[in-house]
């Protein structure tokens, strides 16, 4: 599971931070994710958007920029990120550190039940810096240490 905004997508300028329609891929995110997909990874995404029209815009961006993957998850009314992570139970969760909105307490993994968290490889990258530093090989990714 890969978080979209701040992890693989960023605003095209600082003035467009809250305009998700203007977001673009961060560095070589598409190439990296394509590599994982071609190695057999089931690639799924999680967006911060809640409103259907905004979720649809993120979906359009992912398709337009050729991000490969199977599904885009989003929070419905009353849901928290932890609810989605606990329901999906991804092997790997890649997300940014949420620095611009308060840090660790805003992250998806933070409030996941310990027994579920133990089975998830949590990888945290710096917000808006992308995933370029992560390995291309899935076998190396699962052993990656932050």
Show which residues each predicted segment covers:
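Alpha-helical substrate-recognition element adjacent to the catalytic core
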Residues: 1-78
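C-terminal cap/substrate-recognition subdomain and adjoining C-terminal extension
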Residues: 54-146
